[in-house]
């Protein structure tokens, strides 16, 4: 059976989450009237401002950073960063009210990814404790002989 490190699994889940966000946004462009609305300088009836664009950039940059942080952060910081960020994004995407079937589909996929990130990070046990206990067992075994 193929085993994958927890860091790689969490990073892959963030990539899956990002792909769903990106393709949902791309999908919006084929919705009738979407491009025309954007060309008027509004989105969902709200004016498109520099602040709104900056907020959108920050909101997408956090999951992008989590792809990298999931690979690079040490165990404790990694585990809690994944739990906290995934929980915050879960609340955020749940607050988006939508009735479009394609949006609902992507929302379900994003929610599933975030749930699995939280579940995986929560169940993740400190690998150094396991290594330490294994080395203690090895030392104990040598002393008995």
Model region roles, listed by residue range:
Residues 114-135:
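Membrane-water interface at the C-terminal end of transmembrane alpha helices
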Residues 58-66, 86, 110:
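Core segments of transmembrane alpha-helices
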Residues 50-58, 108:
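Structural signature of hydrophobic alpha-helical transmembrane segments
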Residues 17-51:
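Hydrophobic transmembrane helix segments
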Residues 102-120:
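Alpha-helical membrane-associated segments of multi-pass integral membrane proteins
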Residues 1-20:
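Cytosolic juxtamembrane helix and N-cap/initiation of the first transmembrane helix
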């Amino acid at each position: 059976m193929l085993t994958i490190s927890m860091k790689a699994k969490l990073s892959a889940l963030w990539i899956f989450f990002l792909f769903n966000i990106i393709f949902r946004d791309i999908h919006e462009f084929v919705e009738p009237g979407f491009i025309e609305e954007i060309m008027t300088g509004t989105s969902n009836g709200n004016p498109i401002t520099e602040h709104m664009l900056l907020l959108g950039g920050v909101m997408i940059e956090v999951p992008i950073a989590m792809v990298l942080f999931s690979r690079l952060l040490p165990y404790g910081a990694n585990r809690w960063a994944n739990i906290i960020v995934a929980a915050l994004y879960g609340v955020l995407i749940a607050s988006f009210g939508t009735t479009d079937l394609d949006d609902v589909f992507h929302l379900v996929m994003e929610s599933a990814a975030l749930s699995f990130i939280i579940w995986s990070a929560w169940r993740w046990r400190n690998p150094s404790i396991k290594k330490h206990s294994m080395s203690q067992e090895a030392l104990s075994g040598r002393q008995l002989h």
